[in-house]
Amino acid sequence: MKTFISILISLSIAAVSSVAQVSDWKPMQTPDGQPDLQGVWGNNTITPVERLDRFGERQYLTDEEQMLLERRVSEIADEDGDALFGDGVFEAALSGVVNSYDPSTGNYDQAWLVDREIHNRTSQIVDPLNGKYPPLAGEADGVTYNKPQQGNTNPESWLDLTVDDRCISYGAPYLNAGYNSYWQIVQSKTHVVIVQEMMHDARVIPLIERPHIDEKIRLWHGDSRGYFDGETLVIETTNFSDKSTFGHNRSRINIERFTRINEHQMLYSL
């Protein structure tokens, strides 16, 4: 049974064609008079979604840690080892330990991946203060759930593999950065479509009043409805499948907010 969990993930995502910010920028509108959020937006921050245990409740890196991070990320990009995906760059840069993503077969190197943006936050999650997804009801009391084993090491059947290993879903929204971490937003008067590069998933979100589907119907990416609150697009999503094991898909409702803050940046929160 799902329980309500409350988190706040905040980050700024940038348009692919980013240039210098224009100081006199005014909010753009579509022909229908809606805030214009259309474009291809990239989330390439190096900041992990969940905070590493080593930081406890510390929200920011020290100046020394950030300088070390910048230097090590540059060094890792020049090395010949396997590429580091998602949070792996952050962990390797701070710990000095670089582990292969796929030691059995190897992988392409870092030169094939996008340059990462370095910020001083220790996690994208800012609430709860520990920077981590809250536990499901029961998990805090030591109850364990029957979930597929992470990774693809010696599975006995396809049921032992996670839905991301099986290329079914990486969750919606897809929050990991630096690899397939682009969203394309397309708008009409009645709908917003968010195409996630990862798994090529398209979220078709009505902007018109329409009741949610029956609560007995559960979907990988839930059932979304959207509306505009001033310059902000608000998307409320319910009816997530129990099979969607990603932390932000375990609540009864996800509320996302998209606010364009200049021509090339969008403020996103969940």
Language model regions located:
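Positively charged n-region of N-terminal signal peptides that target proteins for export
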Residues: 1-4
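PEST-like low-complexity, intrinsically disordered acidic/proline/serine-rich tracts
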Residues: 21-270
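Sec/Tat signal peptide C-region and signal peptidase I cleavage site
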Residues: 16-20
